[in-house]
Amino acid sequence: MSSIAPDRPTDAASPHYSRSLLLLLATIAGVSVANIYYNQPLLDSFRAAFPDHASWIGAIPTATQLGYAAGMFLLAPLGDRFDRRLLILLQIAGLSVALVAAAAAPSLTVLAAASLAIGVLATIAQQAVPFAAEIAPPAARGQAVGTVMSGLLIGILLARTAAGFVAEYFGWRAVFGASVAALVALAAVIVLRLPKSSPTSTLPYGKLLGSMWHLAAELRGLREASLTGAAIFAAFSAFWPVLTLLLAGAPFHLGPQAAGLFGIVGAAGALAAPYAGRVADKRGPRAIISLAIALVALSFVIFALSGASIAGLVIGVIVLDVGVQAAQISNQSRIYALKPDARSRVNTVYMVCYFIGGALGSSAGVAAWRAFGWTGMCAAGLAFAALAGASHLRGGKRGG
């Protein structure tokens, strides 16, 4: 579409492309995205700290994920227009301020507002992933994206582990303070090691945002991948907040540390990321996405049949996270090939939908848990997996 111009196409490998740079981008993605998941194993701690608003604790992860979706829409497209290195450093500064506000929050309302700001500013990862796609040669793009996404998934999952341990011994407020220290250290490395990126668009900010609607209308494959990804992440997000509540009650009576330990189990899914990327590079992503959706559905069957046993939870978490990660890598490999000169904006459309799905999944999971218990949460997860499957099959019939 002419309304998306003026952009300059770019699909060549950068001279900066290296394994060490990919690992730095993976670290940036993991450390930044972890901030939107630190609160999930802390829900029982929030309930104890703010007993007058215990029924509203589900608003904290929901606010964070909605903030992330808003940040992706408002901030992530700037990567096509400005140097991503500068954008990353500016967002780290703002994120640190929001984390300090969360650590000092005197009420659940203030914590929710700080969580919203954390979500908006933690979109640093959405500069790192397109950066990897930009610097990689086309034949290695899936593997490069997979490497950075490994860091992102490890950040998501180990965030729960780290938050659980810190909260167990130092209290939940210390979790946010520790994150500030990690971000400051990361910023120092970025200043020394991360190269500048090359902007691919000269559109002013308003038109840059508006062009995303044109991209979504133009690219059928982007619409399909966005709905499929949103439904898969909704299933993923329905599970994790409820896990904390499940483990805190009978028969487990376990604290946030135990909930966090499941992050280590789930990190096994990150091992599938580079492999999924390589397979997507060689065989195409559609078959990988089909398998991934089946794994996500299977995980909730395992959760339902296990009767909420520890063994069933461990097996289900591994299956769930492998499925989610494989689907994410394959979807992103697809969308980055659709419009090389607009990768940040294409990624924004996809990831805004993705995290709106996550916010809906968090709310639906907690609501289903309160209304119908563990079985209700499992049913919600299966429903989201079914939606992902329907979207993917429909796209396949249309040749998307």
Q: Model-predicted segments: where are they?
A:
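Structural signature of the two symmetry-related core transmembrane helices
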Residues: 86-100, 287-302, 382
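Juxtamembrane intracellular "pre-TM" segments in multi-pass secondary transporters
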Residues: 7-16, 194-226
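Helix-loop-helix hairpin linking two adjacent transmembrane segments in secondary transporters
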Residues: 147-192
